[in-house]
Swiss-Prot record:
This is Putative ankyrin repeat protein R267. SUPFAM superfamilies: Ankyrin repeat (SSF48403). Keywords: ANK repeat, Repeat. It holds the Pfam family Ank. It comes from Acanthamoeba polyphaga mimivirus (APMV). ANK repeats lie at residues 104-133, 134-163, 165-193, 194-223, 224-253, 254-283, 284-313, 315-343, 344-373.
Length: 433
């Protein structure tokens, strides 16, 4: 005989959990039943009507259906335990335990109902489900998923759409659901909540229509040092940046945050737009070069310089960082522009060697860098940091230099050396005939 008590279980759309595919009727655990732990494999989970809305979304498990659950209590092999959500030491076996969540080795599944349907929500509430459990989780879940019928019904029976720090409003902004935002505004939601959280987050996520609606409703674009436009630029949302500029945002706010972060993240079109706006205002943005160099974006470096940034900014900081981080293309570009590669006592070579950037080391030496600078710093630190390819290369160059230094002061050896060079050149030329 089965229990007359009705329990409930929420399943995902595939009705699978821990590898088990749920079906109508009896479901039997194929593996060993787990007597201990919480939210672990080794059992079928279910709850009573009152607590069912606790599990709409649980531990990353997104609910789609709710199933009626009955228990085969007359089966001698049936096992049921209370799952100890908070008290990990409490675990007892029983036939009809108190509590809000249980685990069994066998369950019988009845009707399957879609959670997105208003009739399903009404049915569960009639069965005893608490519609405001967990800080009005049900209405927050309905807002997040755009279930307007369910929202209206819940508001009619007293649910609080602003509960849990306006979570419903926040999730709407995050998802970019413009229709839901319009609905919430009609219902009296405060768009200025939490220092204009809404427009800042909408700009961050690039939700153009949401930002536009909030602007039309009077959101403060200047909040927290022009944070909306700074976040839009930082995340590459070109259209949102243009929109906010049209509403009067200060694009240079917070020490040129917008162009520096857009440059760092490689958003070419945003950088170009902001650079032009800053030029119109006579505002320099040389420091954006540093941001671009940190991530090695040559295209952004070129764009900034072509639009007025000074590549010699802060004692050629871009060149020094490019050497330090191994950005060979930027190093070459800086040299073409006229950078003295020996600046600051051959800083570029010293740090390229220290960090193991062989291509940069080779390029710098080819163009006149001094491997002996600062008491053979490059050689010492290449060895110290186990960059043996760089160390070997530098030692070979050092040996060649020592040979040249030696023969330079010996006339006989110098003459012999030049004869060897001339003879080698003749042989090569003869072979090429």
């Amino acid at each position: 005989m089965n229990s007359a008590t009705k329990f409930f279980k929420i399943t995902n759309k595939k009705q699978k959990h821990y590898g088990h595919k749920y079906k109508k009727g009896i479901n039997i655990l194929p593996d060993k039943f787990n007597l201990t732990g919480s939210c672990v494999k080794g059992g079928f989970y279910f709850t009573n009507a009152r607590n069912i809305f606790n599990y709409l979304e649980y531990n990353g498990y997104v609910g789609y259906y709710v199933r009626e659950v009955y228990l085969p209590i007359s089966d001698p092999e049936f096992i049921m335990v209370k799952d100890p959500d908070n008290d990990k030491s409490f675990m007892i076996m029983m036939n009809d335990p108190p509590g809000d969540k249980w685990r069994a080795n066998k369950i019988i599944l009845g009707s399957k109902l879609e959670l997105s349907k208003l009739d399903t929500i009404k049915y569960l509430i009639q069965e005893g489900a608490d519609p405001i459990i967990r800080n009005n989780l049900l209405i927050r879940w309905a807002v997040k998923n755009g279930y307007l019928e369910i929202i209206e019904y819940l508001l009619d029976i007293g649910a609080n759409i602003r509960d849990y720090h306006n979570d419903a409003f926040k999730s709407t902004i995050k998802s970019g659901n413009n229709d839901m935002l319009k609905y919430l505004i009609i219902k009296g939601i405060d768009i200025h909540f939490d220092d204009n959280y809404a427009i800042k987050r909408a700009a961050y996520y690039g939700h153009y229509d949401v930002v536009k609606l909030l602007l039309e409703k009077g959101a403060n674009i200047h909040t927290n040092y022009e944070e909306p436009i700074r976040l839009a630029a930082e995340n590459g949302h070109y259209d949102v940046v243009v929109l906010l500029l049209n509403y009067g945002c200060d694009i240079s706010a917070y020490h040129n945050y917008a162009i520096k972060t857009a440059a760092r993240n490689g958003y070419y079109n945003v950088v170009l737009l902001v650079a032009k706006k800053l030029n119109e205002q006579g505002i320099r943005f040389d420091d954006a070069l540093i941001s671009a160099c940190n991530t090695g974006s040559l295209s952004i470096i070129k764009l900034l310089i072509e639009n007025g940034a000074d590549y010699s900014y802060n004692d050629y900081e871009v060149f020094k960082l490019a050497c330090k981080y191994g950005h060979i293309n930027i190093v070459r570009y800086m040299f073409i522009l006229g950078t003295d590669i020996t600046i600051k006592n051959n800083y570029g070579l010293r740090w390229a060697a220290r960090n193991g950037h062989l291509l940069v080391v080779e390029y710098l030496i080819e163009h006149g860098a001094n491997i002996h600078a600062k008491n053979n710093y490059a050689i010492k630190w290449a060895f110290e940091n186990d960059h043996y390819d760089v160390y070997t290369f530098l030692k070979e160059i050092q040996s060649i230099n020592e040979i040249f230094e030696y023969i330079k002061y010996d006339r006989i050896l110098m003459n012999i050396f030049y004869k060897i060079v001339n003879l080698t050149t003749c042989i090569i030329n003869f072979d090429n005939l």
